[in-house]
């Protein structure tokens, strides 16, 4: 989506979906259509898959002492087509304060603690959550225990946010439409052209007179 416009019905999007469909049963097991993050990680970490797309926490688990992949995993940006650009999905973990809280000062003080350098380093070590503070990607002490951040830094710099901000309250509906149409291509029920036409209609209906 560009500036809130629905632009999914185009040949390049259709071609990308058809390409992914062509991987099914070849370089991608058909069972992947039923996987969530942890199922994907288990297959990959057991050495039964060559590639995996997942969140940063997986790196730490793959390098654990009991992991058969310790020292054998690399991280790269998602591939792009000839005229595209490499980009990953930007997500995050957010803290928020209820506007009706009776103790806003205490709530703000707590969030400052939970989001400071020390807390983010602890979350990185214990949970594998990548920091949101850019300075930590240059911190030698942090890199000593999490060298993967040198790779993540450049990848995150090229990240593209999900359309949640643009689509506002309609994002769950948008996300569900994208999921269902993509799934229908990957399981062979329709081709990329039909899917992008269908998705264009669904997203246009969701938008209505404007995202709100």
Q: What do these predicted regions represent?
A:
Residues 2-34, 78:
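Glycine-centered hinge/linker elements that transmit conformational signals in sensory
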Residues 25-26, 68-69, 83, 100-107, ...:
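Short helix-loop capping/hinge motifs at secondary-structure junctions, enriched
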Residues 31-45:
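Short helix-initiation/N-cap motifs at beta->coil->alpha
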Residues 50-54:
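Paired acidic/hydrophobic, glycine-rich loop segments that form the ligand-binding mouth/hinge
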């Amino acid at each position: 989506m560009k500036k809130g416009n629905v632009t999914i019905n185009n040949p390049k999007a259709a071609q990308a979906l058809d390409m992914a469909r062509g991987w099914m049963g070849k370089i991608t097991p058909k069972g992947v259509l039923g996987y969530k993050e942890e199922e994907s990680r288990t297959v990959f970490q057991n050495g039964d898959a060559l590639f995996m797309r997942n969140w940063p926490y997986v790196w730490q688990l793959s390098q654990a002492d009991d992991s058969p992949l310790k020292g054998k995993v690399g991280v790269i940006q998602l591939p792009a087509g000839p005229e595209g650009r490499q980009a990953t999905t930007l997500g995050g973990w957010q803290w928020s304060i209820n506007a009706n809280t009776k103790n806003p000062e205490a709530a703000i003080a707590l969030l400052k603690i939970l989001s400071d350098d020390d807390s983010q380093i602890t979350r990185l070590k214990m949970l594998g959550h990548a920091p949101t503070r850019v300075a930590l990607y240059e911190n030698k002490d942090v890199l000593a225990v999490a060298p993967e951040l040198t790779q993540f830094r450049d990848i995150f710099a090229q990240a593209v946010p999900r359309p949640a901000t643009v689509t506002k309250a309609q994002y769950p509906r948008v996300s569900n439409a994208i999921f269902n149409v993509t799934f229908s291509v990957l399981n062979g029920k329709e081709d990329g052209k039909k899917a992008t036409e269908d998705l264009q209609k669904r997203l246009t209906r969701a938008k209505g007179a404007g995202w709100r």
